[in-house]
Amino acid sequence: MAKESYKRDKPHVNIGTIGHVDHGKTTLTAAITSVLAKQGLAQQRDFGSIDKAPEERERGITISTAHVEYQTKKRHYAHIDCPGHADYIKNMITGAAQMDGAILVVAGTDGPMPQTREHILLARQVNVPALVVYLNKVDIADPELIELVELELRELLTEYNFPGDDIPIIKGSALKALDGDLEGEKSIMELMDAVDEFIPEPLRDIDKPFLMPVEDVFSISGRGTVGTGRIERGRIKINEEVEIVGIKPTRKSVVTGIEMFQKLLDEGQAGDNAGLLLRGVDKTELERGMVIAKPGTIKPHTKFKAEVYILRKEEGGRHTPFFNGYRPQFYFRTTDVTGSVTLPEGVEMVMPGDNLSVDVELIVPIAMDENLRFAIREGGRTVGAGSVTKIIE
């Protein structure tokens, strides 16, 4: 069967299910597709096909993730669900599946559990903009307990700087919805309405300020220096002023030509692989790892806080722990930069498989803002991944 072309008639939003093991994340994902399929807004996916998620590699890390798509009357959603707890941590830290919002699934029978807390914390650390809660298994939970669970959840969300009092908490049973029970199905529709309303529409990459990481540099005799790379966000037109940021002191230039596949363009935009001809820039002044950006929109930094995941030995990571002062390479966008790691107080060492917050100081400044993802490497081999949570200087 030929693939249908993707129609862009509705805003697109990326979401995912998060929460403690066995609280019903995958059942809920299957139930959403089943209920929306009856309205012609999704293809039904059964539990098994979501649960046996294929493995993918992102920044050298293997993650199992199921991708499901569906629509509501207002939006088109790409939804991710991960089989294992470690897959969630890796997914959120590597940004393999950038989430514009998430559905936190909590079993009414158990209430918040350790992974519930950990997923909320991670969602805060990696800046998932909004959460909606599905309180699952309410058909088999004590009604008084459910009220307590709701209060506890709102307090927990507030503790991690989410608007605990305002977040919609939808009560239902994903299993009943999946079995075609009307009450269950109603809770799924309520949930989708809450997701439509409460999770904000993301700013598209093309609407953000222009930024292109430099991958390669050429000089064209008599014309100047060309930086090539894939435009990460925004758009650029000929004769616009740009800044070259990172590694060396920031300097300004003007784009005098934009080339793509040997053709000259008036404008380049997010997603394009382009070459930018820069006025008055010598070939020695531009190098891989710098970025070309709209002036004033990004600055170079050397010190930051990050949330990191360290690969297990079985994932191709280190076989031994590391200690305070560890000096690997940090791979940002297109280049490796050496940096030293300071562990949090009270943490003596980090074992393969751990995730934690660390402070990093790089030997040269790199253009960065909060949420920038990076890989941690040793001699070209990926041993971890991270996300910048706070810039220090």
Swiss-Prot record:
Residues 19-26 are annotated as: G1. The keyword Cytoplasm applies. Its EC number is 3.6.5.3. Residues 136-139 are annotated as: G4. Its main location: cytoplasm. GTP hydrolase that promotes the GTP-dependent binding of aminoacyl-tRNA to the A-site of ribosomes during protein biosynthesis. This is Elongation factor Tu. It comes from Chlorobium phaeobacteroides (strain DSM 266 / SMG 266 / 2430).
